[in-house]
């Protein structure tokens, strides 16, 4: 038998499949028995130990020292079957050489015994056998695509939703909360409102809403690269500060990092000592083309520059309260650049007058919330500008005119044009409002959706009977309404309410008495009723 190599693959052996001949060797049977082949004890192919690979054991190495290594080359186990081969090399225990084989130890039970003679490893044969390599790294497995599992934390859309939800749940923008009702002016005022001493004492105390910000977005920055990128993008959309020390620390780092952010929200909250230099520094490092919410709450020395309104068509909310530098010129600039403005709150800006509000009224026609309340210089805001603003903005829901010198004319315009939408109306300290406006408007059943009406120190209003009746009608409809008045007006309102209750009680009693004492009330007399029952 001659085995001659046909081809060689120096890079990678061919694949081995049991039913396919790879033609690595040409096999030609001959009559001569090869001299280098040696018979060995047969093993049953049905045993499980025959099917599993073996590793040399210590017992095998000890026995192998007494035997010289075979110099025969490795023979492929995938030799084609033929009758000659089966008869020539049959390894059956019933052969004539059984006596010689009985003297050898039984290796069938030795689990660490290999099937073939040991082979010296060299660069040409790095593995135990040719088939051990092909089974591990066959070409079929190499051609199959590798299965990769994508985590949900690697999908940008899902990560953006996760971080956005974390931002909504944990990020608290500093702003003034809307109180359920204003703090009473005195202890007697609190007793008049609540009627209970404990509740009156609680109402006079200051309540602060504590928000637990545990740095959720900071943790999101450290998840992976995608989380860091998405979180940085979301953080850059909101720029707000309520602590001057933190603001100065940020500005120092801003000079070094040269960050260029694009916020949609810009809020400064109660920075009483901040100066205009801060605005000049910040505007050079920010792009305000996406700004929608601009708020300077109680920042008396800060003035927004024209860069803040560079893309004013996107701005929908401007809140600037307690400013000593905002004037009519700023409102004129807002009116020109912010036609889509919806919320304008400029309380306690004493330099604002009818001139600036007139410009807003002419150009901004989508307003839903306006607040021009003030304590001083209320004479600068009158009917001449407010009436035009009401006529051009019929969708007003919240109107604050505290301290302004408006008259009943403005309130009637508001009742006619904004009656269906108005929900909150503040008329505190309005000296020119009389009984010809609010009492008659509510008696006419206008302001059907109003929920808060503030009339503190509106001392010319003395007729509260229509107001009380309107409140009771709203409560009967299931709509709760809050009417805020000062202590003197509260006493007057309570007295008129008691008089109304007395009149109502007296009418109820008269109706019951008339029904009980009327002879012709339609009831059958008792004797007639008894007689009719007897006849039945």
UniProtKB/Swiss-Prot annotation:
The keyword Nucleotide-binding does not apply. It is found in: Cytoplasm; Nucleus. Residues 32-44 have a biased composition (Basic and acidic residues). SUPFAM superfamilies: RNI-like. The keyword Nucleus applies. One of its GO terms (cellular component) is SCF ubiquitin ligase complex. GO terms for biological process: cell division; SCF-dependent proteasomal ubiquitin-dependent protein catabolic process. Residues 94-106 have a biased composition (Low complexity). Its main location: cytoplasm. Residues 27-77, 94-123 are annotated as: Disordered. Keywords: Cell cycle, Cell division, Cytoplasm, Mitosis, Nucleus. Residues 45-58, 114-123 have a biased composition (Polar residues). InterPro entries: Leu-rich_rpt, Leu-rich_rpt_Cys-con_subtyp, LRR_dom_sf. It holds the Pfam family LRR_6. PANTHER family: F-BOX PROTEIN YLR352W, PARTNER OF PAIRED, ISOFORM B-RELATED. Belongs to the AMN1 family. Negative regulator of the mitotic exit network (MEN), required for multiple cell cycle checkpoints. Required for daughter cell separation and chromosome stability. Involved in copper sensitivity. This is Antagonist of mitotic exit network protein 1. The gene is AMN1.
């Amino acid at each position: 038998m001659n085995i001659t190599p046909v081809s060689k693959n120096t890079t990678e052996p061919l694949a081995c499949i049991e039913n396919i001949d790879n033609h690595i060797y040409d096999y030609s049977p001959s009559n001569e028995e090869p001299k280098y082949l040696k018979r060995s004890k047969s093993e049953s192919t049905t045993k499980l130990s025959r099917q599993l690979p073996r590793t040399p054991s210590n017992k095998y190495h000890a026995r192998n020292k007494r035997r010289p290594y075979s110099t025969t080359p490795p023979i492929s186990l995938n030799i084609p079957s033929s009758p000659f081969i089966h008869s020539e090399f049959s390894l059956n225990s019933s052969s004539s050489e059984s006596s010689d084989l009985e003297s050898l130890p039984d290796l069938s039970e030795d689990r660490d015994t290999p099937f073939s003679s040991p082979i010296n490893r060299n660069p040409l044969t790095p593995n135990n056998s040719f088939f051990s390599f092909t089974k591990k790294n066959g070409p079929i497995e190499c051609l199959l695509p590798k299965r990769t599992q994508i985590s949900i934390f690697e999908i940008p859309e899902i990560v953006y939703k996760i971080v956005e939800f974390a931002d909504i749940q944990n990020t608290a923008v500093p702003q003034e909360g809307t109180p359920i009702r204003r703090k009473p002016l005195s202890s007697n005022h609190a007793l008049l409102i609540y009627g209970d001493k404990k509740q009156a004492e609680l109402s006079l105390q200051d309540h602060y809403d504590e928000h637990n910000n545990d740095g959720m977005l900071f943790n999101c920055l450290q998840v992976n690269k995608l989380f860091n990128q998405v979180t940085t993008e979301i953080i850059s959309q909101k720029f707000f500060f309520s602590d001057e020390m933190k603001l100065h620390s940020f500005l120092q780092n801003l000079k070094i990092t040269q960050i260029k952010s694009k916020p949609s929200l810009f809020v400064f909250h109660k920075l009483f000592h901040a100066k205009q230099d801060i605005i000049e520094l910040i505007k050079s490092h920010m792009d305000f083309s996406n700004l929608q919410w601009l708020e300077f709450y109680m920042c008396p020395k800060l003035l927004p520059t024209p860069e803040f309104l560079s893309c004013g068509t996107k701005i929908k909310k401007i809140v600037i309260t307690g400013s000593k530098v905002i004037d009519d010129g700023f409102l004129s600039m807002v009116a020109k650049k912010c036609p889509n403005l919806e919320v304008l709150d400029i309380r306690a800006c004493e330099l604002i007058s009818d001139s600036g509000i007139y410009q807003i009224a002419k150009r901004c026609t989508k307003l839903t919330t306006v607040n021009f309340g003030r304590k001083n210089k209320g004479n600068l805001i009158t009917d001449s500008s407010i009436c035009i603003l009401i006529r051009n903005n019929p969708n007003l829901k919240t109107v604050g005119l505290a301290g302004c010198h408006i008259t009943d004319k403005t309130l009637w315009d508001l009742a006619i044009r904004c009656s269906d939408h108005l929900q909150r109306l503040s008329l505190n300290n309005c000296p020119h409002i009389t009984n010809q406006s609010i009492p008659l408007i509510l008696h006419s059943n206008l302001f059907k959706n109003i929920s808060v009406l503030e009339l503190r120190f509106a001392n010319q209003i003395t007729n509260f009977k229509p107001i009380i009746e309107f409140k009771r009608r709203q409560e009967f409809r299931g709509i709760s309404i809050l009417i805020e008045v000062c202590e003197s007006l509260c006493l007057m309102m309570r007295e008129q309410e008691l008089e109304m209750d007395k009149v109502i009680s007296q009418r109820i009693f008269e109706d019951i008495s008339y029904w009980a004492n009327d002879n012709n009330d339609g009831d059958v007399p008792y004797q007639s009723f008894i007689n009719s029952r007897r006849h039945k």
